[in-house]
Amino acid sequence: MIPDVSKALSWLEAHPKVLCGIHRGIERETLRVTPDGHLAATGHPVELGKSLTHKWITTDFAESLLEFITPVDDNIDHTLHFLSDLHRYTARHLTNERMWPMSMPCFIEAEDKITLAQFGTSNVGRFKTLYREGLKNRYGALMQTISGVHYNFSLPIEFWQAWANITDEETGKEAISDGYLRLIRNYYRFGWIIPFFFGASPAICGSFLKGRKTNLPFENTPKGAKYLPYATSLRLSDLGYTNKSQSDLDITFNHLETYVKGLKKAIHKPSEEFAKLGVKKDGKYIQLNTNVLQIENELYAPIRPKRVVKGDESPSDALLRGGIEYIEVRSLDINPFTPIGVDETQIRFLDLFLIWCVLADAPEMNAEELACCRANWNNVILEGRKPGQVIGMGCGERKEPLAQVGKALFADLQRVAKVLDSCSGTKYLEVCLKLEEMFDNPQLTFSGRLLEKIKAQGIGGYGLSLAEEYHQQLVNTAYEVLTDDAFEHERISSIKRQADLEKSDTISFDEYLKLHAGPNNDGVAS
């Protein structure tokens, strides 16, 4: 049913200290909205500094799509307090606006109302905005306003020294990369458990479907929302942030070199569909190039191997240089039951699950099995709470009840929890006991709880009431780790950093694009 992890768990129980010092970081996106729930038409608030260069507060696709970024930390409480302070400071400087508390947007009548994120006049800033212009023209702007939470995770070097028998990160980078790729393969095989518990987009506003074809059997709430009775995360479905043009890319997770090779091939592979758009229209750039991927970040994935880049390095070149440094989990919807979009239970569960993914045997995965794994995910995304829902084991081999597979996994996770709790208290085991109950009571999952609220109040009504409640909560509570002085210092520093960037440009934007936009970066619409 699931891999036999008993030997690895026994090893872990004999080496409990190797898990003390897990490093984490959180990125949370949220839309700025008006009091009636429409997208804010204002620019990025000046009190938040420059989104291009601010360390903690930036923008994602749209000018109204805020993104909060915590520094790397090994203390869960400190990370969540830091994230809370970013929300507190922002709320204090949003006078007539609120932060939308859900993944799926509402009240967007027209895509032309969505302003792309603006990053100033430097070449790098203009490049980032043009990349977003390309996303808009390729996939539509509405899809890009969907919000999520990204969780960055890395195991301490002490774990790898004991697990892979290495001496340090540099000499052991291949073993560490292999370990993280093992994690990724198991994530594809069993990560559907994340939307089962934490998917929080079982319904969408009717406006989200305007002009879009779907064969999904939506039902309507009295307030006009469209929902699937057992859905968990429509954000992760074909209606959400996915990219069908990437479905035939040969990107695998067995070896770092082949992963990078597949990624580089995709950013050089011409797309007939995107070539029809052209790179310029009426003399204005509308995308970086006409390849399947404009840049590597365009690759849609529920999890990514990462390394901090140096200078102008691409993400894949950074991986080749130093190996995988950490993992970015991208399957979390916004948690609507907390002002900051993510909570401690989720973080502790992800720790447990990702550690299990490293420990469990993970045979190499071909394209066929990857497609089978995606089918499992899709079943959970669209019908995860359906009574008797089953999960495919392998490709067409057999199907097992989701609850049965989940409970078998939790028997292992409880052993991991006891090891982690030896570093600090009993909270990991408590998380296991709390979540395991949801297999028998799926109405307790985020999607189950949220759907009941949406049926009663509508997405707009419930979302706006939460947005106002959280706004008042944030503005009326004190900072926990940061200060107004710290925020003001970072605001001023971000302004200076952006000004320095703009002064340092020595070539035109056209020349910059020739250097950085990859092949197939000229041509007009056909």
UniProtKB/Swiss-Prot annotation:
Give the intrachain disulfide bonds.
none
Question: What GO annotations for molecular function exist for this entry?
Answer: ATP binding; glutamate-cysteine ligase activity; metal ion binding
Question: What GO biological process terms does the UniProt entry carry, in alphabetical order?
Answer: glutathione biosynthetic process
Entry's SUPFAM superfamilies? Answer: Glutamine synthetase/guanido kinase
EC numbers for this chain: 6.3.2.2
Instruction: Kindly indicate where the leader peptide sits in this chain.
Output: none
**Any idea which UniProt keywords this protein has?**
ATP-binding, Glutathione biosynthesis, Ligase, Nucleotide-binding
Q: Name one Pfam family in it.
A: Glu_cys_ligase
The reaction(s) annotated as catalysed by this protein in its Swiss-Prot or TrEMBL entry are: L-cysteine + L-glutamate + ATP = gamma-L-glutamyl-L-cysteine + ADP + phosphate + H(+)
In what pathway does it function?
Answer: Sulfur metabolism; glutathione biosynthesis; glutathione from L-cysteine and L-glutamate: step 1/2
Return the InterPro entries for the record. Answer: Gln_synth/guanido_kin_cat_dom (IPR014746), Glu_cys_ligase (IPR007370), Glut_cys_ligase (IPR006334)
CC terms in the record's Gene Ontology section: cytosol
Q: Indicate the family of this protein.
A: Belongs to the glutamate--cysteine ligase type 1 family. Type 1 subfamily.
Q: What HAMAP family does this protein's entry cite?
A: Glu_cys_ligase
The entry's protein name is Glutamate--cysteine ligase
The organism's lineage is: Bacteria, Pseudomonadati, Pseudomonadota, Gammaproteobacteria, Enterobacterales
